[in-house]
């Protein structure tokens, strides 16, 4: 019967990076605010409501993250000036006063719009339409009153909002490029010029913007461009274009956004992203009719796509920092969003907790913005025969190509740490392609594809057992890879599979056994016998991991051929690790594997193979969770093994062992991205206490197989001496 235990969140001793990865909550708001991260680029703003500027916790978020504020609705004409002679300044003033008190400048939004407008301006007291001159008089009074009231705190105004027609309004030949609003029907496009004229009169120093959505759609983009150019050529004081940025996680791509900014920068020197949010569906724009989403948590793969889209957008915005001067998020949190909480559009969730997308936006790599991978791509060494993709280059980048024509999204789980993987995008041929954002750690990595939320392997690669399933695999070139490279000019041993019955588990178990070249041959009339290293895998893996991913047999062959070690046997068995579940603190004793190893496997190995007997001819070592098993078993049963090794699997302390005579050699190792300080201290303490201890810190690696290949290579040279 299977016994399930709750694992100690992998191992506190593994490494700080691994421990964080396996479940320690991460505060993504820790670190500098967005306004500080982007101080050399552009200001970062947020649209706020009444609660945002009255709740203490929300105000602290605003003050830390943002240096520009927009009133979401309070300054719109229909809100602040609902009737002739009636003004609602209360909420508008409270937002302005919050900004005054905290030294935050404001973007004014908005003075003239077809929606949420003061429609009374179009009719007289009898409800009849007025002439445009009356409308202009009323509009001028409105603009002057609002602008003058807040000119001390406002640095920019969205003067005219959304005056251009959407693509779906352009289906008829000769259709007007303008939205058929009451403003346009009464005044033509002259109302745009008049609104800017009135705003400039009221505040000669404020920046004046035309603001619109769907600005990355080529048709809408060009209509906006043509109108603004026409107005500026006629002397209308338009200082900048506001690109609303009501995007989604699929659109726009980098090319479309880049083209829109480049196009607009031909006619204005200042562009603001005025209302940024990312829906998690395929809708976009400023329409008030949209899907509200389902009332359920955001799927992790959707969050990854959203993070990637934010990353791509801000990369383009940083590229255009000469013209992009402000980026404003439309609302503080998902709870506040006009799109509804179930669209999950913002970097703060419904509880005002920062999402990983906040860190993605904030913690950008300046060097990566303009980095172009070296064009020396070759097929991944782990590919299926004849498959060109995925590919790797000499710098450590990986790139992928996946044919999934009907998919909405494809994510490769391989990517920079903590980012959820590499999101692929469709190319012009409809094929999903993408490159890791930066160089990967060298060596072997597991990965899989997430296609529309489903998990699949990459058909281009072989499969490798890891994470309790068969995964795709990729090999990133390493500077020292010769020590695990297969060499045709040396003799090679072989690996045999051994099946044995385990009474303790009630099933057949499997071990892979490396036998060095020359095993079984007569030497001076006798068959030579060999010491044995029992070498354990980590959680989610099995007896195939060390022979295949770890290249243990090749490493042994090379060491023997180079005269660095005398031949010995290596036994790689399944360590019963995969029934243990990650989660809260529980109990893990390795007692089950101890029984299997000592009472069942060792007798089989010593009966079937030419082994030397006794503890001084046995070593036990393991990586990760296999290291945890190694430590527990060697401390409880020191009479069985004389050589001990922990590979990213924790450390020994002298007071745990108590007697240096019980062990001839202790090895401890990890990657320099794990817990090198812990390894160095432990080895120093052991040496000071009289133990023969050695440590290795693997350069440029983390909790991964190149770390453990290097550890095996180093450790093997000190075994059985």
Regions found by a protein language model. Give the residues of each.
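Boundary/entry segment of secreted carbohydrate-active catalytic domains
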Residues: 22-68, 72
